[in-house]
Amino acid sequence: DDRNSAKFVPLSVVTNDAPRHVKHPRINWQDLVIYEAHVKGLTWANPEIPEEERGTYKALGHQSTIDYLKKIGVNAIELLPIHEHATEPAIWARGRRNHWGYNAIAFSTPHRGYASTSDPISELQEAVDRLHENGIEVILDVVYNHTAEGGPGGPHITFKGIDNRNWYRHGGTSHYIDNTGCGNTFSAGKPHGVRLVIDSLRWWSQVIGVDGFRFDLAPALNRTGNMIDSALFAAIAADPVLRQMKLIAEPWDISRYSLGEFQYPWREWNDYYRDAVRQFWLGDIARGYGEGVSALASSISGSSNIFYFRGPTSSVNFITAHDGFTMNDLVNYHQKNNLANGEDNRDGNNTNRSWNVGVEGPTDDPKILQIRQSLQKSLMATLLLSSGVPMITMGDEVGRTQFGSNNAFTLPIDLNKENWNGVSAWNGGWTLDWEPNEANQDLQNAFMELIRIRQTTLSRSQYLATTCRFLSSSLSRISRFQ
């Protein structure tokens, strides 16, 4: 491709963004409740925000957004990538866009598509400050493991045009090493790669003012040995600013699984926990026997079999995340439905550990509906009452559905509902429902009560087995969910 991309993606833009004083909430890990959300999806349907501001950084800092987060009881929001990103050419050709944003073209630039003004930096800073003023921390999902340039046939819009050989990992003259499943692997372990990532992290920390980072496909950032030997992670540990940030690893990539290998003060997404909880509630109970009790017990007590002396707050517990079924879909669907992405349903995981309670998708059967509602509450209770750091996915508290999609990373280029051709043409449920029906309001009430219980009696930094004590029975202190 010999077209000039300079007017779309200049190789450099020099700015003078000075570090600023930021009042971080500094919430202890054992008190943290993380809410994973998308800037646009969280605010797009909020009726209290002017239409022209919905889906933007300004909407993120709107008082109604903040009031909602405070009402449900979460105190940290983990934002899907907000750095400048691009849609893959093949996806764009199908009339769709990359909604999630895991396709970076500029590590230290806020995505312009989420700005309501011509000054996205100031707009984002104001949103972060407003969240901080209300006791809510901001964690960014950052993608330094690959870029939007893809493999050998991909576009030349950033690092390929500067120094392709040194900015990407190569296995031969032109062969890209792909540890990410996205066509390339960024050389984050080389000195120039380390410097760039550190500078980017410091920019987000000191200029924007965020409180922490979740590192996408973290093992891909280090291919030289174990996590202790990583040049990048060593540089983060030595940096006086970054070592104070909250650091969360997604401890796997497509060729390496590293759960439990990261060292303090890192925390890790715990998919062992996810699978154990799903297997117990949606696998064993569905079959009428409980082989997964042992795995469930170790998981809810802090996963000491994985994190050992590091303690339970090393585990970020989750049952759902942006990729995979929503909690509602876990009890509605057995089969994935990713046809909207245009890949003939080949994409997405085929192993979901879900249970549709005998009917695939929506039903009017009151008995099935009651079981599904109870299962969602059981999943919520397990997550929020476990030792570790809980993370809930946006909308699970109000029964958000993606209609069986477990890879809802694309949306139509045109978000006008009048132009959507049925459920099969889009990954539904990409926005938060700000006006839930009676059943979903019931879920939200249960969610809020569970967080209240957690924050008043179950916050702990040690494994359950070392802190367990018996309390006198008092029915007035018992919360019961059906």
Predicted feature descriptions by range:
Residues 13, 222, 229-394, 407-409, ...:
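Conserved alpha/beta catalytic core and glycan-binding cleft of carbohydrate-active enzymes
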Residues 1-35, 40, 57, 69, ...:
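Carbohydrate-interacting/catalytic domains
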Residues 40-210, 217-241:
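Substrate-binding/active-site clefts of carbohydrate-active enzymes
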Residues 1-114, 313-352:
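N-terminal structural segment of carbohydrate-active enzymes
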Residues 33-35, 77-79, 138-140, 213-215, ...:
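Hydrophobic faces of well-ordered beta-strands that scaffold small-molecule active sites
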Residues 113, 183-186, 215, 219, ...:
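Glycine- and acidic
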Residues 99-108, 158-172, 268-280, 413-419, ...:
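Acidic, His- and aromatic-enriched active-site or binding-groove loops in soluble protein domains
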Residues 39-44, 83-85, 145, 219-220, ...:
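Short, solvent-exposed loop/turn segments at secondary-structure junctions
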